Amino acid sequence: MDIKYNVSKIKDSKEEIVKDAVSVEEPLEMRLKYKKNGKIETQNISITMRTPGNDEDLIRGFLFNERIIENMDEIDSIQNIGDPVGDYNLHNVIEATINKTDNLDIGKLKRNFVTNSSCGVCGKTSLDSIEVLKNDKLDSHFPKIKEEIILKSPSLLMNEQSEFAKTGGIHASALIDEAGLVIATREDVGRHNALDKLLGHTIQNGLLNIKAQFIACSGRLNFELVQKGLMANIGIMAGVGAPTSLAVDLAKRFDMTLLGFVKESGFNIYSNKDRIILG
């Protein structure tokens, strides 16, 4: 599932407005209904960011892989809860009813699934847990970063990735200033962890200057990465991969400049192009 956005495509210092397909990212709250001591209990078990579609397969696989069930016969039914919501008119809550009562590990159901290295919000157990703790928009007057620095950012990031050079299997985030100087870089198998490490280090050591710096990330930019950047008042976030729909919508809402598909030959601007100096 995807949605089209108007995007400023930058190449050779020229801007072209094009329609760009962006993968939809939406939260799915998963609930479990089961019988305990003769009573029907309902438990929120997790929330995950997903591309809508095949949600029944998703909860089946989740229950099996977490060994909440041993086989698919233990699932009596799966149903969507509530009315379709949001911009895409989607069901974002799904509930599985199981007939398993013996040896059901309730503690496993209640634990926070924070170990998923690709999605930090997957540990949340309610849609109410996903919110942006920010009220005001970013100052649109800064930072101002030249096109040439943005184009160099993937190589600047790669040059600082010592672990990636060894393993090829790790993400990174870098804080880069307006002159193209890499202030700091942090790596992790989880892209959200890499950004947390970077912001933790730079804020703790007084290295963050939001008026003259931006953040470059490996991989795609999703909702959570943009959310983390917003909490640190980062004006520009650039990724070598594609953003998701929630990332674009969130960036637009708070006036962040969001860049995707950044490479030496060009990049896409998904929101607030005014911070980028072309030419």
How should these model regions be labeled?
Residues 192-269, 275-278:
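Feature captures the catalytic cores and cofactor-binding loops of soluble hydro-lyases/lyases
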Residues 1-173, 177-178, 182-184:
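Intrinsically disordered, low-complexity regions enriched in acidic/Ser/Thr/Pro/Gln residues
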Residues 176-177, 270-272:
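Short beta-strand-to-turn element immediately C-terminal to the catalytic PLP-Schiff-base lysine
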Residues 163-215:
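Glycine- and Gly-Pro-enriched alpha-helical subdomains that act as flexible
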Residues 58-63, 73, 108-111, 136-137, ...:
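Surface-exposed beta-strand edges and their flanking turn/coil or helix-capping segments
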Residues 93-107, 185-193, 230-240:
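Short, Lys/Arg-enriched charge-dense amphipathic segments
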